[in-house]
UniProtKB/Swiss-Prot annotation:
The lineage of its organism: Eukaryota, Metazoa, Chordata, Craniata, Vertebrata. This is Prolactin-2. Pfam families: Hormone_1. GO terms for biological process: cell surface receptor signaling pathway via JAK-STAT; negative regulation of gene expression; positive regulation of gene expression; positive regulation of leukocyte proliferation; positive regulation of phagocytosis; positive regulation of reactive oxygen species biosynthetic process; positive regulation of receptor signaling pathway via JAK-STAT; positive regulation of respiratory burst. GO terms for molecular function: hormone activity; prolactin receptor binding; superoxide-generating NADPH oxidase activator activity. It comes from Oncorhynchus tshawytscha. GO terms for cellular component: extracellular space. PROSITE patterns: SOMATOTROPIN_1, SOMATOTROPIN_2. The gene is prl2. Belongs to the somatotropin/prolactin family. Keywords: Disulfide bond, Hormone, Secreted, Signal.
Amino acid sequence: MARRSQGTKLHLAVLCLVVSCHAIGLSDLMERASQRSDKLHSLSTSLNKDLDSHFPPMGRVMMPRPSMCHTSSLQIPKDKEQALRVSENELISLARSLLLAWNDPLLLLSSEAPTLPHPSNGDISSKIRELQDYSKSLGDGLDILVNKMGPSSQYISLIPFKGGDLGNDKTSRLINFHFLMSCFRRDSHKIDSFLKVLRCRATKMRPETC
């Protein structure tokens, strides 16, 4: 019931945003998107801490490198200094491309979480579903933003996800689950950073304060 209530609140928030989008200024829309991306990153950080609490001793050694994340092929700014030099249209495109690239991986994580060999798999499963809700909410909000910004901001890079299996043994499942979550945490941080830069520009804040 709590899960349904949370999802309903999020979707109602999106509906309200859709209905009133034409009356809301760009800076307010950016602020709302930034709040959602902040929550998304906060949840992913919490999930990584949960997974760290019960991780195989050799997990860090065996876990794939960050360069193996399926979104690593996307050319993005490496830090805030670079992001501040990127246009608004490109930043919103990058944020949407990264978010879209996680639809299938989040489905996989959601299906695997309930039987994950981890003592907190119930909490992990619940948080994964929250991630899906916030991801959809943020995606809907960004769709509204690009419609307000114009056609030049609507380009999306499609990033394929080929990993449909976490493995058969307990160690492989934990490591691959943790790896995917670490990739998501990294990308959620990028999405949040890009949207905060856009919010700063929309509110005409000084770039160095973004």
